[in-house]
């Protein structure tokens, strides 16, 4: 992991890991941590160093948004316009602008969340999101199918990467902030980086396997 290319940032997935494990990674220089449970992330935010950049990487429920808006650096999993609008509403109340990634469904499993490419195109073309002044769409996120088939993983990541280029050219050509492509986890981040990822979400390779 120390060999990461310059443009790739590491999100250390610290969910279910104790503060001590995060502090150890922090002392080693890691500053970006990813959590998928609102309550857990908020508790950690309150008790850990304030220069940590907290990324929310789970499935976000609309009624929980208000708890993370004051401090979250990036929300990776925006999978509906409704969710985006609610983040905007809560961010406006908090006097903040929240960075968000649109989550695309690229895997074969039905269990994964996200827009289809067509749904995402429709939402962006409709243009209502331009009225939301308290969110900033900074890029896209996706999860590949959990499989040992490297070719399939590569194909899924490449499809998201080319969709990113399409979206950037069509709707965010002048937006410098639209530059993040969050894809790749412990088992497939090499393929993700090769396909153009700028954010990899890695847990077990840093913290070891979790004890549930």
Pin down the residues of each PLM region.
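Divalent-metal-activated hydrolytic enzyme cores
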Residues: 198-199
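Short C-terminal tail/terminal secondary-structure segment
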Residues: 202-212
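Conserved alpha/beta-domain cores
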Residues: 1-187, 193-195, 207-209
């Amino acid at each position: 992991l120390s060999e990461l290319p310059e443009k790739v940032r590491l999100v250390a997935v610290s969910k279910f890991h104790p503060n001590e494990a995060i502090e150890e990674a922090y002392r080693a220089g890691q500053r970006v941590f990813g959590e998928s449970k609102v309550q857990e992330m908020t508790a950690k935010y309150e008790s850990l160093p304030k220069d940590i950049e907290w990324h929310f990487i789970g499935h976000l429920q609309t009624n929980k948004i208000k708890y993370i808006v004051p401090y979250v650096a990036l929300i990776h999993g925006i999978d509906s316009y409704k969710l985006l609008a609610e983040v905007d509403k809560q961010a406006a109340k908090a006097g903040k602008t929240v960075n968000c990634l649109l989550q695309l469904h690229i895997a074969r499993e039905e269990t994964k969340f996200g827009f289809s490419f067509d749904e995402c195109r429709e939402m962006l073309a409709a243009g209502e999101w331009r009225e939301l002044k308290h969110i900033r769409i900074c890029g896209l996120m996706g999860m590949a199918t959990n499989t040992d088939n490297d070719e399939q993983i590569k194909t899924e990541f490449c499809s998201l990467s080319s969709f990113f280029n399409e979206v950037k050219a069509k709707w965010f050509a002048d937006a410098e902030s639209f530059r993040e492509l969050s894809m790749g986890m412990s088992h497939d981040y090499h393929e993700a980086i090769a396909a153009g990822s700028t954010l990899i979400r890695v847990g077990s390779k840093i913290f070891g396997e979790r004890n549930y």
